[in-house]
């Protein structure tokens, strides 16, 4: 299973923060006043920049804020899936989450995790700027592949206006699919004979168009994504009833809502040789995001979502910088993560014009259950793999 633009003239070095903080867009949030002694809380840990790896650090901080995912690794549940097959990425991810939640340091290095990912995707070892959304897809896919198991499940299908339920062949599920996987349903209506067919597609990230160059809301982006499309001319589809290509109307709804829904804003616009970044100020709610208008009525459960993490992007297509805002389940406070720099921020500062990815949860996060750090039951073959890493 596979889950499914940057143009400054000078790439900014990994630790050259001054160039970014001179940008107006980088000064749109304030941290809370620092006390003389900053207490260290679980899950509030900085990450070292290993050379243009801010994209990775921002994604790791967001995943570190997803308590059900963290609990799965801290409790050792992932180890059962690795008894026979060792995934270096998964093992390194588990060790990193443990360090970020149970370690004593204010900052840790993700070098081992980057090395494991880079062994599969060498592009991430080049110390060049990468796209945070693409990195998230790679990480979720690798974790799913390592932790998946086969099971039979029921799938609902809508036929001729009625809902039916049928068994399907074994499906591959994991902690990743249980948390992040949703399903889109496409209703395709032939405009000639009015026959209707349906198609389903799973997703882990929804990439949303931005309908304005200046200012809009998340709801505006969602309405643009889910608006009915008409397929004409070269986009006509084959109608099995008419036995010829016809114009068609396509309506998209959500037929399965995920526990964690990730929105990606299409800020990078590339048309031929012309590249630009859309700097639209997108307003998004911190609480009570209602997706009911976009959910198929048959499966409607009226879930309300609360924001739990944000990935911000500063700069342009070929040279930019990523940071993250994450809500901690222990303190219930928001924190800004800028590589090794960590600071608490007020709720009012979470809304920025630089948001690139939004993580929403339909359930409040609790403090992750965990084993003692000394209780290491990692399989021996995984430990041997770890010893090979730098």
Curated annotation (Swiss-Prot):
Single GO molecular function: cysteine-type deubiquitinase activity
Name of the gene: Usp50
Protein name as it appears in the record: Ubiquitin carboxyl-terminal hydrolase 50
EC number of the protein: 3.4.19.12
Presence of keyword Magnesium: no
Coiled coil (UniProt feature): none
Gene3D superfamilies per UniProt: Cysteine proteinases
Reaction(s) catalysed by this chain's protein: Thiol-dependent hydrolysis of ester, thioester, amide, peptide and isopeptide bonds formed by the C-terminal Gly of ubiquitin (a 76-residue protein attached to proteins as an intracellular targeting signal)
InterPro entries, sorted: Papain-like_cys_pep_sf, Peptidase_C19_UCH, Ub_carboxyl-term_hydrolase, USP_CS, USP_dom
Entries under Pfam families matching the protein: UCH
GO BP term (any one): proteolysis
SUPFAM superfamilies: Cysteine proteinases (SSF54001)
Catalytic residues as annotated in Swiss-Prot or TrEMBL: 54, 321
